[in-house]
Structure formats: structure tokens, C-alpha cells
Amino acid sequence: MFQDNPLLAQLKQQIQENLPKKEGTIKATEKGFGFLEVDSKTSFFIPPAYMKKCMHGDKVIAIIRTENEREVAEPQELVEQMLNRFIGRVKMFKGKLNVVPDHPQLKKMSLKAKTKKGLNPQEFAEGDWVVGHLIRHPLKDDNGFFVEISEKITDADDKIAPWWVTLAENDLPNSEPAGIDDWQIKDDADLERIDMTHIPFVTIDGESTKDMDDALYAKKNDAGDFELTIAIADPTAYITPDDEMDKVARERGFTIYLPGRNIPMLPRDLADELCSLIEGEIRPALCCTVTVSKDGVIGDDIQFFAANIKSHARLAYDNVSDWLETGSCEKWQPSEEIAAIVRDLYEFSQARAEWREKNAVVFPDRPDYRFELSEDNDVVAIHADMRRSANRLVEESMITANICAGKTLQAHFGTGVFNCHAGFKPEKIADVVELVNPEGTLEFTAESIATREGFAALRRWLSKQETTYLDNRIRKFQTYSEVSNQPLPHYAMGLDIYATWTSPIRKYGDMINHRMLKALILNKEPVQKPDDSVGEELALHRKHHKIAERNVADWLYARTLADAPENQTLFTGEIFDINRAGMRIRLLENGAAAFIPGSLIIDNKERIECNGDLGTVSIDKEVVYKLGDVLEVVLADVNQENRSLVAKPTQVFAELPVVEETQN
């Protein structure tokens, strides 16, 4: 009788129009109900029936009404849906295709699905990994959620899943770009390449490295200063800005480095063969020579030139480090000529490191965690590789080369691709001073730490403190590193200028800088200058690559450490973040991140306080943990679905003594 009654519908609409409305974000719970979060302090309850119209993360407008003496929100209008393109797993329901999103808050949702035109639904099985697109939403078109599957990523039980799924999730390629049959050198007709094949350059890389993009040569002169030559692989000899391959390189931005594998920015036949500075092979290169004083000061005699070079020795980090640190190496005995070059390079690197420690900023040594995989993509071991003498030798050479490029590009063009860092966020400078100089007895003032010199001096002072507590606190007040086409300083490195050109096989920005440096050599206008958007593009690529690297690592850690809770394996954890729910630690044995909830420190909310602002955990108002502390832990839970680790300190905090009431 009342069905489709226009008067009733009109009355209902009028009532709804008079009810208050709020815009907010949906927060789902595991129990079916949810909340509309309007801001950090305001939220409204959403009953299970209303939650069926939306999903976690949706931004909606909801009407607020009172039901059973409680204010509730009923989502009415979709502002922005949380899911668009997403990764999920196939779930068969009564023989019909469904997709479960691979998202911690959405894993209980099974969404009806179809395959896009050209895909055979019969080829999909339970648990397969797919790319889905949410094409229907209840708040948009009065129908249930509906998904179109555009791509199958891999089978349910494929061990390659962590890599392929993560790359698909971030919309990144999972293979190298296609090469061409006949690469030709396309140098400017006026570019002269100096024959330097007689100069005994050496490459120092990892044992398995194929894309060797830098070769080094140093000679100590009679005054004790170092004449350094850096030769860098030259892919822009083969690729012009108008080539299709240049567009591909720009779209990729960087070679993607994931645990156990990489996805090159350029085709492997170029990166690993034609451009790679392979021992005994003549290669085109872009070179820089500079004199560095015995005190580590970079001279004004910086020169860039094009050359043909030949690596005279392919060396490995560990072998060179063993030889430098102990005087011998079982696996490698250098000729007198190569030994002299390596020794001079090492002495140069020590002079530069000493200069940077006094005048700039040297980052603390932390291990590089490396996953060793079997042919079946199982983790065989996780190695903590410390940076050794040879690593530092190459690092100092590259930093020197990039300072030279920065100075040159700034002086001649006033533009280029520069790595920059602005120091502290302006609005946080007063907080930094209050933290490090509360009594006003130190040299650090709001004015001084706003300068590059003052920022670097503060970082050097922090590195000498007994604990890393202040260093960890202050990191939150820093800006992020950026890529810019303007010559801006790099506060975090303590340098006036920094422009990378030493990895053009792996970084598109370095290719641009190569073209500009060649223009300088030719005394012509550059064939390519960095536009205003290139910095943001490269930063976005870098962000997605970092997320992908972390996600693959988290997945592999969860697989590898699955038995650790049962075995009660002991780990050493370093606290790197504290919030009101608990603290986050890095396991020093393998690099995995784990969360320690407050309840696993002590199961009494009244006694514990986790203070994110101060970076401390207190029990009974006494600080027991702070940022930078190292503690012994066991893993309490390894969640394979969320790829997350929960840890628990082995330290047990005593119960409060029970005070017995005395009878009068």
C-alpha cells in the first residue's frame, strides 16, 4: 500500500533534508559496525546495516540521526571512494567470481566480480592474485559493490607473488624495457672523445653486479695531493631526448631495487653489456678530473670531458676491503699497478671523509640487509652487510664527483637536476632549539640552525652524543630531501650543492645532467634541460619504489620469521618510533620492523604511558624506554595476511605490591 508512494517519498526526503549532515571518513571494525570520523576528536557510530553501503576508507557525507537514544551516522553520498584500482585475490562463491581486496581492513569483504573483455573467467582459480577495479558502489548507483578484473598477476601458490603483487600494486613494471636490435652511438658530430684506454681505471662493485656504471683512477702527486679521475658509463651516447627509449626511461625514473632482484630502467643489453664498464672492453664514458688536497679539499680545477675508456680490473668490495684492512686477501692479489691505484684511492677517500666529518655531515654506518634467495624464491638467509673500506672509498669518490657536477652546472647553466634538502621545517626550528639548547649554553640558536653551516654543526654535535635519543627526536622536525631544477643546498649532507650524474644507467635525472655536461664540453646549448615537473616526477617514482621495496621485504620477513614466535627466538631491537599505542623497533639481526603494543610491555593501562611527543615509554611515571634504546625481544605474532610482526620485550616489569588494609 505504501510502496512507491510519492507523498511518503517526499516526506522522507524532507525529513532527511532537515537532519544534520557531516562529511567524514569511514573506519570499519571487524565486528561489522563502523565509525564516521569527522576529525581527530569527532566520530559517529555506524550500525552494521548502514555499513553495507560503504567500505573502510570511503569519504562520505552522512546524515546524523538518533536511534535508540544514540547518535548514529547513515552514509548518504559518496565524496571519494577508497578503492579504485586495487590488488585482490579470487574467491569462488557458488561457482561465481568474487574478489577479496588485499587490504588489512577489507579482507572480510568478498566483492562480486567479472573479468574484462578478452580475459577468460575459466582461467581464474581460488586464491589467484588479480588487479581489480571497483566499477559499482552502493552510494553511487543503488547497486551492490561490483569489480572488474583487468589482469591476472600470478597463481595462488606462486612463490614469486611478493614481487609481482607488490609491483602491480604500485603500478610498476615487472620486467626490463624491450631493447632494440642494433644500438648505434649518436654522439654530436662535434663531440671529441679522448682515448683514455691506457689509463688503468678500476671498477669496484658487488660480486654479482652487472650494470657497472663507474670506474675510478687516482694518483697521489709529490705534494701529497690526489689527482682523481671518475669515468661514468654513457647511455646518452646511445639515447637522444627524442628517442622512444628516453620516454621509457623517464616514465620509469629509476632502476627498481627490490630484495633479491631488480627491474632495470634501461634494457639489460644496454645496462649490463653495451654501457657497463666491463673489464677489458672499450666503452664510451663521461669523465671528470679534479685535484683533491691531502686535507680533503676539492680543487677549482674541475674538468669534464668525453672519452673512450677501458676498465683494467673488475674488483669486488669484500676482496678490496680485506686487502685494505688486513694487507692481504686470499681471493685476490692485485698487480703492483692496481695495488698503487687502490691505495691512492683509499687515502683520497680517508682525506675526504675526514674533511666531511669536520665540515659537512657524515651519515652513521648502518648495515645493508640483503636477502639471499634460492632458485625457487625461498629466503635462504638474510645478511647484514656492514659498509667497509672499499664501500667508503667508492662512496667518497661518488660524492666528490657529484659535488663537482653540482658546482659546474650551477656556474655554467644555473640549472640542472639537483638533490637538495632544506634542513628543519621553519615552524619547528623553535622546538629544535628548545630540545637541544634549553639552557641557552650551546651555540645553537634559531638563527644559526636555519643556515646550512649551523644545521651541519648541530648534526655533527648530535653524532657525538652518547645516545641517539635527541637525534631520533629531531628527525621528525626535518624536511624531506627533494629533487629540484634549481641549485639549492643539501642541508642533510652539509653541502652547498649536489647534483648526481654517476648512475645514468639507473637514474633518469643523471641522464639529464649528462646531456647538460656534454653541452658544456661542446660549448653549445643543452639538447635537454630539466623542466619544472621533473623533480616532482622523480620524487614520486622514488616514493613508489621505496614503498615497493619495503612491502616486498615485509612479506619476506613474515615468511622467514613464521616460526620465531613458537621457537621463542631472541632478537635485539632498536626503537625508532613511539606513539600512544606502543613502539616500533628494527630487529638488528635482519632489519625487520616490528610493533610492540603497550599491553605487551605491561598489561595495565593505568601504569603505562607511551608518549609520542617526548619519544618515551614510562611505567609508574618512570621512563623505561626511549627512542634509540636497544632491547631484547621475542616475536609474539607473525601475521602472514598483513605481513606484520608483533614483538614483546623479554624484560618483565614487577607487579605493584598489594597494600593490605589494616584493621583498627
Curated annotation (Swiss-Prot):
It is found in: Cytoplasm. Coiled coil: none annotated. Residues 568-650 form the S1 motif domain. One of its GO terms (biological process) is mRNA catabolic process. The keyword Cytoplasm applies. Gene3D superfamilies: 2.40.50.640, Nucleic acid-binding proteins. Its EC number is 3.1.13.1. It is an enzyme of class 3 (hydrolase). Residues 193-521 form the RNB domain. Keywords: Cytoplasm, Exonuclease, Hydrolase, Nuclease, RNA-binding. GO terms for cellular component: cytosol. InterPro entries: CSD, NA-bd_OB-fold, RNase_B_OB_dom, RNase_II, RNase_II/R, RNase_II/R_CS, RNase_II/RNase_R, RNR_Ribonuclease. It catalyses: Exonucleolytic cleavage in the 3'- to 5'-direction to yield nucleoside 5'-phosphates. GO terms for molecular function: exoribonuclease II activity; RNA binding. Belongs to the RNR ribonuclease family. RNase II subfamily. Involved in mRNA degradation. Hydrolyzes single-stranded polyribonucleotides processively in the 3' to 5' direction. This is Exoribonuclease 2. It comes from Vibrio vulnificus (strain YJ016). The gene is rnb.
